[in-house]
UniProtKB/Swiss-Prot annotation:
It is found in: Cytoplasm. Its main location: cytoplasm. One of its GO terms (molecular function) is DNA binding. One of its GO terms (cellular component) is cytosol. Keywords: Cytoplasm, DNA-binding, Transcription, Transcription regulation. GO terms for biological process: regulation of DNA-templated transcription. This is Probable transcriptional regulatory protein BARBAKC583_0163. Gene3D superfamilies: 1.10.10.200, 3.30.70.980.
Amino acid sequence: MAGHSQFKNIMHRKGRQDAVRSKVFSKLAREITVAAKQGSPDPAMNPRLRLAVQNAKSQSMPKDNIERAIKKASGGDVENYDEVRYEGYGPGGVAIIVEALTDNRNRTASNVRAAFTKAGGALGETGSVGFMFNRIGEIIYKPEAGTAESVMEAAIEAGAEDVQSEETGHHITCAFEDIGEVSKMLEATLGEAESIKTIWKPTTLAPVDEEKAMSILRLISTLEEDDDVQNVYANFDVSDEVLAALSA
């Protein structure tokens, strides 16, 4: 069975790679600036900034771009961004959480609501679908970081809660509040991670057919194209057959 991560790969293959990369860099830079403004500009002293910089590096964001985003936080004309979470239902009753960093709540809310409505879904109140997800930390290592056994051992020692080792890499999860310490201990043993972030993991999945899957794909794509939207999470599940049809 498959879900959002595979859909993101499909979207990136179908879209213009340069445009996708530019959009990703813009969102990463915004998160870095907000993190630096809220705490120390030194990643070693600011856990949120450290995670933001690490993710930027994993996406091959140039060092100059990262440093520029950090320096922007100390400028007098830097925008004030609010962290906002939207929740609602998409096609097929799929629960969706949207995280945004915005300098205009009205604009972002209007755009998100319009995207849901156009897709045949509905934007709800905060908390309307959040209970279907758990907020956790996710740390991803490339396959060459170690064997399944060695990574499992390192993860247990670091205080992680679960490890899934596959051909594509090692996916380590931990409690939301422990991600800073767990990732730091893992780095000492396994080296630099490919990705370190907090996510909303669904507790239950909603199976969808190809038609509904296409509608969800379009909705997620529309949401992620919005400059204010940082992350989109959904609890849909598609069969391997449907995923193959979408990938064609």
